[in-house]
Amino acid sequence: GCATTTVKSSPEDFIRIEGQDLIAPDGSKFFIKGTNLGNWLNPEGYMFGFSKTNSARMIDQMFCEMVGPDFTAEFWEMFKDNYVTRADIEFIASTGANTIRLPFHYKLFTDEDYMGRTVAQDGFERVDSVITWCRDNGLYVILDMHDAPGGQTGDNIDDSYGYPWLLESEKSQQLFCDIWRKIADYYKDEPVIL
């Protein structure tokens, strides 16, 4: 991934915008054809088949209540290691797709408790893997902070407390911007990211 491999790129390697069109490095119009990797880095209840336990926070709490925090932490590590793999990306590429949307929870780039970890989240490690797999298979990646600090919709999909606090909380807004700056700086030379 980007953490272990230096990506040598120039502006010509990136998809660019001309008017309303996306332009591929070869000069042709680029049309996004793809899918997303939902539920992997931002668990959602409906994707697990749950009817009432629907946000990442609630799912984690339910698991902790049912099997305890130690097994829950082990479960999340196994889940992240196996829910999406290189083979999945290879299959997606074989269908003719050219892009993957990667929804993620902001906590993957913080030291907040999330998916079994209490410090040193593994967001860059997880995204690095997807980027490497996508680069190897000719796919682009759209990074999607699906769960922003404070929540951006107030619905279960953003793991909020029922209100879009991101829109009112300066602390949440600052954290949102800080995380995106960190991600942008880390991946600034990676042309696979749209």
Question: At which residue positions do the language-model features occur?
Answer:
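N-terminal Sec signal peptide cleavage junction
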Residues: 2-4
